[in-house]
From Swiss-Prot:
Its EC number is 3.1.-.-. Influenza RNA polymerase is composed of three subunits: PB1, PB2 and PA. Interacts (via C-terminus) with PB1 (via N-terminus). The gene is PA. Its cofactor is Mn(2+). Mn(2+) 1 binds at H37, D104, E115, I116. Phosphorylated on serines and threonines by host kinases, including human casein kinase II. It comes from the Viruses. Keywords: Cap snatching, Endonuclease, Eukaryotic host gene expression shutoff by virus, Eukaryotic host transcription shutoff by virus, Host cytoplasm, Host gene expression shutoff by virus, Host nucleus, Host-virus interaction, Hydrolase, Inhibition of host RNA polymerase II by virus, Manganese, Metal-binding, Nuclease, Phosphoprotein. Belongs to the influenza viruses PA family. The keyword Ligase does not apply. InterPro entries: INFV_PA, PA/PA-X, PA/PA-X_sf. This is Polymerase acidic protein. GO terms for cellular component: host cell cytoplasm; host cell nucleus.
Length: 712
């Protein structure tokens, strides 16, 4: 296609497509259409001038000193902002009605905008589509076809015969050029209806009044404001920009020095509690190696098989009650699970899924019939004191040490591999050697990482829960929490962490909540850090024999039970937790790239194989922590995984706002003499997010360590 047009037109067409996020290499027909259209617009305007007597004349090679003005203003081929600026200024100076869509040309002789069309179909069809689309009496339409036909509004063709013949000849040449390269047939057939021109959205009525009322000071109308915004140059001196914006703003730029920043204030209050959807470092697995039982791979079969590996069950009792809940119900729920699993065993054929009986304890735990009754708005809009519930402010919590321990554990290696080599996904294109080498090195560093176990566990639980929520909306389905891995010797292993019982799940919207009760095995005694387990009721359900250096010891086995909830959108993201692998791989790649550009050769091999080199991992009160490249990979992965496990509005806000302060501090560290205004406001915005979320509080304390060291 490129060879059929001149380089300037090709460049403009590529720019136009990029602006709409389209790729000329892929959408070649569209690319050809845009090139053709641009060329016709330029030819339309070529050689046409207006002389000093305001007469329209044609000059092909004339006196360069003659006072001539171009007859046509070319709008097509400019970027959107610029194009609208031109249209606005034409309308302001000539009083012509402003078009809804960006036209192609403006004719200073006839004082009208022109819409040019080039079609591979019937000119009439295309003309009608254009007319229907722009719905404006004022804009003149002129359509050309590749077969030499044309059609224009009121049969007024604007230009002389010869100029139009030149355009038709060129179109015919383009057609031949494309045909000789085997492009024409596909191009001819690919034309779709009219859809690409951008609409100028007119605001009327109430919305218009609201818009006019909410303009910044010093703007008399929405139009003025639009024109100002279109012409706003984003770079330049800040003080100048601010004074340009408004007389009321007088931002004094304060220098940001080593002594300027203060640490973030972390909230006081009781220690924060665990809020993840499943247990992390405290989880305990019942496992089977080399599973080959009948129905292997069916979750319920696998779960029963795992349960049978344990012989230390005992009469359960509550060791740490839930402060607000009806604790006997949690106990009864676990007993019910055991009893119903036993019932399954006694049946001839084990079913593939198990729906729990709707007992009073499960109805209570799953919040059945607890939702306030929905009333049609029509029936209550006359109620005089209709208002939303007052919701309590969230209670402040202080940072507790358990969340740092959780993070450290997530960075550690386990003795099993949780992903296969291809888990990060093959590229569609034949991938260059370097990228696959990096991916393999990275996978080797993280495949045994505990954070990777959390990913696979999260993917499994969310997938199973979303499936059950759609397939068994009314049932209290029992969902085993399962993961699969390989041992050091490469043997397959299936693990059971516990069970989930799902509540009613008629999920219409993305944010509609499905309640569930989770019951998870653990060897952690909840009485050691009771604040961490505030939301749980913990039972003691058995004794487990553990092999230690001293011999076998018996340890009590606990069951952590809580009610919880999630939504379609959260489950969707949970199912996609493997993205964390990709995100951390990309962060590592950018480190390798930086290293490689300094050394001017690819450093992938050295990067991963030079075991002596240490890398900065993070800041702690002790200073900058360093570690091997593997440790860096696992730390980055753990951060990404925790961002997913502990996702929350507090985290979103903290990440966005603290990043600004981080950039300022880094600028100071690089001796760039940064300046700020309203630093107090920035601190407020950051600290507003420090309420009670364990992961956000931990990140804030890391941030304080960073500030302290960065500005020493």
């Amino acid at each position: 296609v490129r060879q059929c047009f001149n380089p300037m037109i090709v460049e403009l067409a590529e720019k136009a497509m990029k602006e709409y996020g389209e790729d000329p290499k892929i959408e070649t027909n569209k690319f050809a259409a845009i090139c053709t259209h641009l060329e016709v617009c330029f030819m339309y305007s070529d050689f046409h001038f207006i002389d000093e007597r305001s007469e329209s004349i044609i000059v092909e090679s004339g006196d360069p000193n003659a006072l001539l003005k171009h007859r046509f203003e070319i709008i097509e081929g400019r970027d959107r902002t610029m194009a609208w600026t031109v249209v606005n200024s034409i309308c302001n100076t000539t009083g012509v009605e402003k078009p809804k869509f960006l036209p192609d040309l403006y004719d200073y002789k006839e004082n009208r905008f022109i819409e040019i069309g080039v079609t591979r179909r019937e000119v009439h069809t295309y003309y009608l589509e254009k007319a229907n689309k722009i719905k404006s009496e004022k804009t003149h339409i002129h359509i050309f076809s590749f077969t030499g036909e044309e059609m224009a509004t009121k049969a007024d063709y604007t230009l002389d015969e010869e100029s139009r013949a030149r355009i038709k000849t060129r179109l015919f040449t383009i057609r031949q050029e494309m045909a000789s390269r085997g492009l024409w047939d596909s191009f001819r057939q690919s034309e779709r209806g009219e859809e690409t021109i951008e609409e100028k959205f007119e605001i009327t009525g109430t919305m218009r009044r609201l818009a006019d009322q909410s303009l910044p000071p010093n703007f008399s109308s929405l139009e003025n404001f639009r024109t100002y915004v279109d012409g706003f140059e984003p770079n330049g001196c800040i003080e100048g920009k601010l004074s340009q914006m408004s007389k009321e703003v007088n931002a004094r730029i304060e220098p940001f020095l080593k002594t300027t920043p203060r640490p973030l204030r972390l909230p006081d209050g009781p220690p924060c509690s665990q809020r993840s959807k499943f247990l992390l470092m405290d989880a305990l697995k019942l496992s089977i190696e080399d599973p080959s039982h009948e129905g292997e791979g069916i979750p319920l079969y696998d779960a029963i098989k795992c349960m049978k590996t344990f012989f230390g069950w005992k009469e359960p009792n509550i060791v740490k009650p839930h402060e607000k809940g009806i604790n006997p119900n949690y106990l009864l729920a676990w007993k019910q699970v055991l009893a119903e699993l036993q019932d399954i065993e006694n049946e001839e054929k084990i079913p593939k899924t198990k729906n729990m009986k709707k007992t009073s304890q499960l109805k209570w735990a799953l919040g059945e019939n607890m939702a306030p009754e929905k009333v049609d708005f029509e029936d209550c809009k006359d109620v005089s004191d209709l208002r939303q519930y007052d919701s309590d402010e969230p209670e402040s919590r202080s940072l507790a040490s358990w969340i740092q321990s959780e993070f450290n554990k997530a960075c550690e290696l386990t003795d099993s591999s949780w992903i296969e080599l291809d888990e990060i996904g093959e590229d569609v294109a034949p991938i260059e050697h370097i990228a696959s080498m990096r991916r393999n090195y990275f996978t080797a560093e993280v495949s045994h990482c505990r954070a990777t176990e959390y990913i696979m566990k999260g993917v499994y639980i969310n997938t199973a829960l979303l499936n059950a929520s759609c397939a068994a909306m009314d049932d209290f389905q029992l969902i085993p929490m399962i993961s699969k891995c390989r041992t050091k010797e490469g043997r397959r292993k299936t693990n059971l962490y516990g069970f989930i019982i799902k509540g009613r799940s008629h999920l219409r919207n993305d944010t509609d909540v499905v309640n569930f009760v989770s019951m998870e095995f653990s060897l952690t005694d909840p009485r050691l850090e009771p604040h961490k387990w505030e939301k749980y009721c913990v039972l003691e359900i058995g004794d487990m024999l553990l092999r230690t250096a001293v011999g076998q010891v018996s340890r009590p086995m606990f069951l952590y039970v809580r009610t919880n909830g999630t939504s379609k959108i959260k489950m969707k993201w949970g199912m996609e937790m493997r993205r964390c692998l990709l995100q951390s791989l990309q962060q590592i790649e950018s480190m390798i790239e930086a290293e490689s550009s300094v050394k001017e050769k690819d450093m992938t091999k050295e990067f991963f194989e030079n075991k002596s080199e240490t890398w900065p991992i993070g800041e702690s009160p002790k200073g900058v922590e360093e570690g091997s490249i593997g440790k860096v990979c696992r730390t980055l992965l753990a951060k990404s995984v925790f961002n997913s496990l502990y996702a929350s509005p507090q985290l979103e806000g903290f990440s966005a706002e603290s990043r600004k302060l981080l950039l300022i501090a880094q600028a100071l560290r690089d001796n760039l003499e940064p300046g700020t205004f309203d630093l107090g406001g920035l601190y407020e915005a950051i600290e507003e997010c420090l309420i009670n979320d364990p992961w956000v509080l931990l990140n804030a304390s890391w941030f304080n360590s960073f500030l302290a060291h960065a500005l020493k």
